[in-house]
């Protein structure tokens, strides 16, 4: 009660409104004269064009080319966009909150122009903004240039930019409070803009960088002692020459490297606890970097059977690994998974998403799950949950599920999906084969879907 008594009636109402989605806070203006302008004092603003339409209209407008959009959809989306733009244009400059704690903008129609984005961000920065989030994705692909005052905003803690944003970092700038920086598929003013930005964020803790074709970045060094979380991604056609990552305080690392050749140097991550790796090349080198993690998500996108054989060996052991989420776009997955199980003696949770199957073409790289040479230690002592999303009709996957049930002494629950699109009778037969197989753990619950 003491905290509440410190507020006036209006201040308390504004505080309550700040916990509502902004569009609902605006609607309270019709309640009474007292409420009419209260929303104008809410310090957290969000203008999301998606929220104005049903999913059907957004999908019909955004997916096709502009000339293919039917007149009804175009009219509805365009009129709604104009109303929102007019509303922001009229009310944002007059917003009476002395500090704009956060401004979130998300637009995708040609109604909104790059100049609008620049002006509205400039207003927020002038009000000591702490959080800015801008997602601008018009069909005409015009980039919005951010205002210069953004790069000297001392109050800014969080900056999230997506899609058609031009990040042109000046040679002299200061963002002393910036802790969270997300840059997803944006364009940079020159090849050094991103490097300048990262090299001068001394308290940064959370960084997301997604590079894409035509973004002007060729090389990048991520050397940030304060960084705790890093998500770094490159598209398949990214014209990229190389990167270096040196982050001694990092606890979470996500890497998506779909480039044609691996050209990265990753080092110095002694405190890493969780890793999410999606890659096409150099799997062993990447796995050597994450042997200390407790949680690992591994997504291998490579159809070459021989590319997997270089991974196996006794020199990699995941002594702390408790949770493994394994996705693979390669039919030759069985030996790799068997090796991962052997290399993870403390594994408690296994999720396996089988993307390919090669039943009928078994070769030397296959593991016949009904007769492996030895049982991985984790199955005998620690594995508690198992989830398998199977490739439709995969006998290899069914044999894996049966093997896990037969050998895992501490298993508590097994969640099994045989695969979509399978003949109902064939699916039922596979389910019965798994359901009536022997269980090393008599209390294990099996869930089929």
Curated annotation (Swiss-Prot):
The keyword Transmembrane helix does not apply. Residues 368-418 form the FBD domain. Pfam families: F-box (PF00646), FBD (PF08387), LRR_At5g56370 (PF24758). LRR repeats lie at residues 27-52, 81-107, 158-185, 186-211, 252-279, 328-354. Residues 2-50 form the F-box domain. InterPro entries: F-box-like_dom_sf, F-box_AtFBL13-like, F-box_dom, FBD, FBL13/AtMIF1-like, LRR_dom_sf, LRR_FXL15/At3g58940/PEG3-like. Coiled coil: none annotated. Keywords: Leucine-rich repeat, Repeat. This is Putative F-box/FBD/LRR-repeat protein At5g62970. The lineage of its organism: Eukaryota, Viridiplantae, Streptophyta, Embryophyta, Tracheophyta.
